[in-house]
Amino acid sequence: MFGEWLPAAPRERSLIGASVGSWRFASACLPDAAEGIRRLGHLYTEQNFAKGVTMAQISQSSRRMLDDLLDGRDAALLDNAHYRLNIMVVKSHGLLADDHRGRLGLGLSSVIADNLRGRARLSRHFERVIIHDPRLAPPVNTLNDFPSRFVALNAGNLRQALLASGSIPMVMEGVRDLPGAGAGTFRDGGLLDYHLDLPYSGDDIVLYPHFTDRVIPGWFDKTLPWRRACPARLQNVLLLAPSREYLSRLPYGKLPDRNDFKRFMGDAPSRQKYWRAAMDESRRLGDEFLELAANGRLGERLLTL
């Protein structure tokens, strides 16, 4: 998509993501978008963690991976001619601002309980922060579901913003005092906006390459089948998702995910083989998309979201 399809119709485009989505879009903003995304896949696949790995060790490994990915090309990423990067993070309140496992665990328990009572109650625990390319405002209307604010993205906060956006509690340390966003502890933006159920602005199509055909509002909603995205916010969303038939052909019948590090603990070569096989299959999926688009047949696959 970023290697051929979008460059064939160049224009200013907003890229907005949380967690690994922000890393993927940052990779697409590098001078060679396709190579940047391939590089991210390679670097992540090569990660390996021993049993008992600490949050500090995973954070350090993530910093090294980000260094290898950007390779000193921060300015080129920020100056991309066509893409405007938006990185979503949350500022954590109370016990969630602490990386001590006991206190953080208590804080997460409170979040889970409040989320069951109502998603709006998460405003007690998190503030949404969108760190965006200052050349273009974030592609959203007024955000009034949670306390929210915008921060300009620049060379001084790019790497910290990306690290914060991927900082899952109990897995990685939070990022302290994010430049431009003030004092505090900043974490994975997916905690609030897991699948970006946002009030998108304008009349353009929102193209959403996704790993599932369901839009789940927040990270804590994953086990709540009744918690669904707002239909009004999806009116202009075109979601691209792998079919169940495609997933069934993958090794283990699923896409690779973070839990594979535990599933293959002590056997990194098997996990890496599995992930590489899945990436090879994804390239074939991309070829099929390009063929459908070139032949005007995308409409044959459209379903109501």
Q: What annotation goes with each model-predicted range?
A:
Residues M1-S14, S27-L305:
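Patatin-like phospholipase
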